[in-house]
Amino acid sequence: MAMLLPHPHPDFLKGLLKAPFRCYRFIFHSSTHLGSGIPCAQPFNLLGLHYAKWMLLSDGLKRNLCVQTTLKDHKEGLSDKGQRFVDKLFTGLIQGQRACLAEAKTLVESTHSRKKELAQVLLQKVLLFQREQEQPNKGNPLAFRLGLSGPPGAGKSTFIEYSGKLLTERGHKLSVLAVGPSSCNSGGSLLGDKTRMTEFSRDMNAYIRPSPTRGNLGGVPRTTNEVILLCEGAGYDIILIETVGVGQSEFAVADTVDILFYYCHQLEEMNCRVSKEVYLRWQHGSNNYVCWRLDCASSKDTGRVCDALKLLRRRLAVWRPKVVRISARSWRGGHWNVGYDARILGPNTCQRGAACQTTKATESLDVEPHSGKRVRAFQESPHSPGADSCSGTKGPPWGPGPRASSRFVVEGF
């Protein structure tokens, strides 16, 4: 999508000199067929800048791509103390130090403007490190993201308590992001999920961190994607995301995870409320499970939900949502064994899902009210290098993280 900036050449050149983090070298030709006598000007790639191609017209400038700064440019704005602080967190994070992971998570969730700059540099370094780790695996994601959603009291924390211990015994490293509700008036939160996991919280191969929603109505906080990136950089291969007790419209976690477990209460019949909840989870998540406790649901209930899911359009040719009855305490139902089915769909499916997760996270992290529309316009543009990011095997190329991508699109597009 091209954008025409109606500025005369002298005024525009003066503006370029004042723009931070952008260096240009203009090449002037002798021909004057464009009317102004200065037919074209091209930027050059200095210090690793991902540059855009420019063409000077008679009274304006045509822009085909956006300018994106790299990690080195962000580092230039940091002080020596801030740079040492970021390097310390990054070194401890990739070494698996839990204290550095907790401090990095606090930094990412901060709303202070200076701390946001430090967090952005840290996230870029973690993402570059993660991409290097994924190269031997042909670019496939190394971590498995699993979401747990459902109404209050459905058994989400019980599932994490018992299945988490089993997975750590098998040699996995788990990171649990337990989301708690926040007060709209005082801003306080009740983060009691970790205290109920008495045995699992003492496991050294598990990292449990409660997080408040901070007024976000999607069931998870807005910084969920950044926190997941930090946990993956720290070496955790399974990420469990427990949402708050949700109703019928909180489905933001489906855009973040690879597979979603939705837990239901006891049902005497398949009513309209559950039909709507199952439909919403199915429409907003590719790999879904609808789970009932064995002591609550009957085979008739599961059969009715299966019949309802058959009427919905399939989003993936290799996957259909499943309905299971499980028991975390007695380990009946094999819920974790069936959960691994989503991992064997193939590397292309995993990469495509990761690309779509990053794309949707970029849309949600808007810096100003209309930035989500700008992101969609950028994605639909034929000049966008990430136009086919959700259909191919590569992730979006415009930024190292959702928040940086959103800011990049707003400022440059």
Curated annotation (Swiss-Prot):
Residues 362-406 are annotated as: Disordered. It catalyses: GTP + H2O = GDP + phosphate + H(+). CDD domains: MMAA-like. Its EC number is 3.6.-.-. Residues 1-65 form a transit peptide. GO terms for cellular component: cytoplasm; mitochondrion. It comes from the Eukaryota. Keywords: Chaperone, Cytoplasm, GTP-binding, Hydrolase, Mitochondrion, Nucleotide-binding, Transit peptide. GO terms for molecular function: GTP binding; GTPase activity; identical protein binding; protein homodimerization activity. InterPro entries: GTPase_ArgK, P-loop_NTPase. It holds the Pfam family MeaB. Homodimer. Interacts with MMUT (the apoenzyme form); the interaction is GTP dependent. GTPase, binds and hydrolyzes GTP. Involved in intracellular vitamin B12 metabolism, mediates the transport of cobalamin (Cbl) into mitochondria for the final steps of adenosylcobalamin (AdoCbl) synthesis. Functions as a G-protein chaperone that assists AdoCbl cofactor delivery from MMAB to the methylmalonyl-CoA mutase (MMUT). Plays a dual role as both a protectase and a reactivase for MMUT. Protects MMUT from progressive inactivation by oxidation by decreasing the rate of the formation of the oxidized inactive cofactor hydroxocobalamin (OH2Cbl). Belongs to the SIMIBI class G3E GTPase family. ArgK/MeaB subfamily. This is Methylmalonic aciduria type A homolog, mitochondrial. It comes from Oryctolagus cuniculus (Rabbit).
